[in-house]
């Protein structure tokens, strides 16, 4: 770790950069332009590296942040009730390479959405961001974007991906606006030239907090480079660890404002601290009340993507119309959902709760089943979601509910701890046959993680002396989400890996 100072992304999957001939879409880890990029079988471009030219001033490092799911209270939360959101073990990974001082460029590459661009550091609008009335400190609390600063970065956003279709350009510009606003707010004209490369295992546009995960990665990477974070280290007290993650969370929220305009702050909070939160918003002119569940246990989860397109706005409007037609009845349903959320948080926060106990997990699972039934009564399920429940119930594997807005999207299944592996495999094969995407994940895991330097020890013969260095070429060549997770994942194939470190926020 660096010494401490004492004082997408919403997007499209599968697109790739086509290059526009402007000299800013082809980058190497030396920060220089390069041609002759080759394409692998998936259509994703690979960089040609020139390691001798890079002369990095600091070792490459990585940060990683999780996605999230709503576990209890979707839809009722829109009507002023409480909900619980928790981290999942699907994550985004950001690789940071510091370049030689002579390069004076900063490059952003989000490989999974085909975004790649390089800016000259001196050409960025530092004058606007460095004004005494505008300049922020790393510990500042920023609750709204400055219109003057937003305007100042627009010319540097507009030059990105000019030859891409408009829909893809919007995605790229959203990501770039978040990065540039953070980079210019926290950095200075003397900031070291760098290459920021992102890969993610979180499905995009599925309500799983992919953009917040990216925002947390960007904020934490910049704060680490500024040496404004303490830790993470094993002996750090929980209250100090929470202070560090809150510092990251504040700037991740700024990034989310760039992407979404008026975010709730829930997604970035979960992605930063991990575990889970209870959140409630009774007044939409004010931020929600967010209460961390610091000791939320890790729970085994099967996440299933129905691959059924859905519209959050449409599903929310359906419930609002139903409430208008049957106010007493729908209010009773919403009140019941609120009681389910309260019961779940009380149960999970009990000191005697055992996440390995079938009895305790059954209680949580029963609450999930009740919550789903109430959502069905509001008309926000879908035959594809009900089919998942049918398959899971038939095999007796766990307890399933929809997560998010419904009408398609994803379901979550809390897995029984005693379910035979062959039974789970049979279910997963059936899901694949019926065109579902499934992810075995963990609910309530760690938040932001740091790998400094970018070296992992897997405890295998493949390890080089001192561990396996994760260089940019390996990172970009990892095939799909499984390849990324196997190469740099917190757990990989062999359980907890030596290298990744987390701020320990638990009370115990």
Curated annotation (Swiss-Prot):
Compartments, record wording: Cytoplasm, Cytosol
The entry's keywords: ATP-binding, Cytoplasm, Kinase, Lipid biosynthesis, Lipid metabolism, Magnesium, Metal-binding, Nucleotide-binding, Steroid biosynthesis, Steroid metabolism, Sterol biosynthesis, Sterol metabolism, Transferase
Signal peptide segment: none
Residue sites binding ATP per the record: 68, 200, 205-211
Binding site for Mg(2+): 211, 256
Keyword ATP-binding: yes
Region (Disordered): 1-46
Function: Mevalonate kinase; part of the second module of ergosterol biosynthesis pathway that includes the middle steps of the pathway. ERG12 converts mevalonate into 5-phosphomevalonate. The second module is carried out in the vacuole and involves the formation of farnesyl diphosphate, which is also an important intermediate in the biosynthesis of ubiquinone, dolichol, heme and prenylated proteins. Activity by the mevalonate kinase ERG12 (FG05912) first converts mevalonate into 5-phosphomevalonate.
Family: Belongs to the GHMP kinase family. Mevalonate kinase subfamily.
Protein name: Mevalonate kinase ERG12
